[in-house]
């Protein structure tokens, strides 16, 4: 018997099979890999599954409420980062900035490898990036504003450059001291709370 469908909304599309991957663990702040330039990702290497790597990076970014994370921030020697928000992340394999604006902006940044540290970093306002997607296909995208900044910070990270290296020693020292002070105050307040509860 033949069934006539008058409305395509009546058709139930097959459920998408989305592989579930565990997030990575973040590399310690003093990990050697954070200061290393990561070599080109080889799509032909049999044990490197781009989908798994990209998916795990996305899960890690989501877990830490981050707009972007590079693989070496998770202790992995893959030249890839992901950037995005909610369900809209892009994996950038072997990324390279091919064009940047002369106009710059100076705004606060932080990153998962230096949690709590907030620094005003000067960067180009827009960039054009060439990279390979999950299938190894070459792509070129242009970014402005916050997304351009996230992309630049992640590419820096893959080149062994932390955002703290983009400011003067004086600025970094002041910010580090301010953070240390906040941490000590937080610990003191939490110690007091624990003591009172006993």
Identify the role of each PLM range.
Residues 1-198:
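Positively charged
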């Amino acid at each position: 018997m033949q069934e006539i469908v008058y409305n395509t909304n009546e058709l139930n599309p097959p459920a998408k099979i989305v592989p579930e991957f565990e997030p990575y663990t973040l590399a310690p702040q003093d990990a050697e890999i954070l200061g290393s330039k990561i070599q080109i990702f080889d799509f032909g290497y049999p044990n490197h599954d781009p989908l798994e790597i990209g998916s795990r990076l996305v899960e890690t970014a989501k877990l830490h409420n981050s707009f972007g994370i590079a693989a070496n921030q998770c202790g992995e020697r893959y030249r890839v980062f992901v950037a995005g928000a909610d369900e809209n992340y892009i994996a950038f394999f072997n990324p390279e900035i091919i064009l940047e604006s002369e106009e710059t902006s100076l705004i606060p940044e932080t990153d998962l490898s230096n949690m709590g540290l907030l620094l005003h970093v000067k960067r180009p306002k827009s960039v054009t990036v060439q990279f390979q997607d999950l299938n190894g296909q070459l792509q070129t995208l242009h970014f402005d504003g916050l997304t351009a900044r996230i992309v630049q910070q992640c590419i820096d990270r893959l080149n062994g450059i932390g955002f703290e290296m983009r400011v003067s020693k004086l600025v970094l020292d002041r910010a580090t001291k301010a953070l240390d002070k906040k941490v000590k105050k937080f610990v003191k307040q939490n110690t007091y709370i624990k003591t009172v509860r006993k």
